């Protein structure tokens, strides 16, 4: 979706603020993209980008209050933007599309976050994070199990785990005594839908509390069936990760940030990308966490917390409007999003056509998975954090071994949460 409008007008200068600066991994990609857009359109960018920290957040809010905001802004789409959204200082995607129908038309609107201030979508996202299930396909092949897909159900997943166990392998690489976070999150999500996953229970026996208890009961069930490593209660996450990469375990539930760890594990020198054993890496894949109940398998935990805004100031300036639109379209094209996001979350409708020599096979598989995602929902544990989680996170070994009653553990966490409010 690239606008022709900008090339027709007289060259203009637009001011842009992003967080692609300092140590940000995309700082150079951003500089290169700005230079290419300037070259293509004849326009120029006055770049005000800075490292994402509290200083930048304060500066942006102050800029809006004093009328010195940028024309285009790459910023958080959550509560940090509430002040300038509520003040009407940015233009919604729908309003921009009334004049430029192709604006962000390469994006799946279901994956674009609405502002919490008014439930309207303003920011066009680039990259974010996802949590999903990595697979060692060598183990699946040895056990005669098919690769799980977008249609795999929870019961089918349990059957697969049993076959893997019967073949002498560990079905699930997880250290429940160290990092139970991902299983806690998804097993609770499996009792819910994207619409209610971020609810915090008022008590262990209300609707949400019951869902949490049932989710933890599923983890206990997996433990009792012997689908976790024998040492899952005492092992470290690093140890169970090694069992996965060494071909002893089939499934690993983790985040998009784990792709790099799997890739470097397939290098003879973890620091040197040129030593990658591509045949070894080809044994790894990534897919959706099997769904249960009303959660579709393709509903992922993840998020796109930032995006490009066009300010009202730029929109109302006849000289700058088309250039601002052109800039955002350029920075959010399929090609550019693939470069910035790589294997992380995006809102692209289609898996981008990428130069596969620039990406490894696991990154390409992750991009393909993303194109089938039906929703991204944040992790409820990020809202229910700190000491609230001790009874069910640190307490997971006692929960799965039946030494602690699940409802009591959930209630203890809720009591801690309520006391902190």
Whereabouts are the PLM-identified features?
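Conserved N-terminal structural module of periplasmic/extracytoplasmic solute-binding proteins
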Residues: 1-87, 98, 147, 270, ...
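Periplasmic-binding protein-like
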Residues: 169, 223, 328-350
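Hinge/lid segment of periplasmic solute-binding proteins
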Residues: 8-10, 76-132, 158, 183-190, ...
């Amino acid at each position: 979706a690239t606008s022709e409008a900008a090339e027709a007008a007289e060259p203009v200068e637009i001011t842009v603020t992003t967080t692609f600066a300092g140590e940000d991994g995309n700082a150079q990609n951003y500089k290169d993209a700005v230079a290419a857009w300037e070259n293509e359109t004849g326009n120029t960018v006055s770049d005000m980008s800075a490292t994402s920290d509290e200083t930048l957040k304060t500066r942006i809010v102050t800029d809006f209050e004093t009328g010195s905001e940028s024309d285009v802004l790459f910023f958080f789409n959550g509560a940090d933007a509430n002040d300038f959204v509520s003040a009407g200082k940015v233009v919604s995607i729908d309003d921009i599309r009334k004049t430029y129908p192709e604006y962000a038309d390469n994006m799946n609107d279901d994956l674009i976050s609405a502002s919490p201030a008014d439930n309207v979508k303003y920011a066009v996202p680039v990259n974010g994070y996802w949590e999903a299930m990595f697979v060692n396909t060598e183990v699946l092949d040895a056990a005669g199990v098919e690769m799980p897909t977008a249609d795999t159900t929870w019961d089918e997943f349990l059957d697969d785990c049993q076959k893997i166990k019967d073949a002498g392998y560990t079905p699930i690489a997880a250290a429940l005594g160290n990092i139970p976070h991902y299983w806690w999150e998804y097993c609770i999500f499996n009792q819910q839908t994207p619409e209610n996953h971020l609810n915090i229970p008022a008590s262990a026996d209300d609707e949400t509390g019951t869902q949490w208890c049932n989710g933890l009961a599923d983890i206990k069930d997996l433990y009792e069936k012997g689908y976790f490593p024998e040492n899952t209660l005492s092992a470290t996450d690093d140890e169970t990760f090694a069992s996965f990469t060494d071909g002893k375990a089939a499934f690993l539930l983790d985040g998009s940030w784990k792709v790099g760890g799997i890739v470097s594990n397939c290098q003879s020198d973890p620091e040197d990308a040129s030593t990658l054993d591509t045949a070894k890496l080809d044994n790894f894949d990534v897919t959706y966490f099997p769904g249960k109940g009303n959660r579709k398998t393709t509903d992922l935990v993840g998020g796109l917390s930032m995006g490009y805004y066009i300010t009202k100031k730029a929109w109302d300036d006849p000289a700058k409007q088309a250039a601002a639109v052109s800039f955002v379209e350029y920075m959010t094209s399929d090609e550019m999003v693939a470069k910035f996001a790589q294997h992380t979350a995006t809102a692209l409708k289609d898996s981008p056509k990428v130069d596969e020599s620039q990406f490894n096979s696991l990154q390409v598989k992750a991009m393909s998975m993303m194109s089938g995602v039906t929703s991204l929902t944040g992790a409820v544990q990020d809202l229910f954090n700190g000491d609230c989680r001790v009874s069910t996170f640190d307490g997971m070994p006692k929960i799965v071994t039946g030494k602690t009653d699940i409802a009591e553990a959930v209630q203890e966490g809720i009591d801690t949460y309520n006391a902190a409010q």
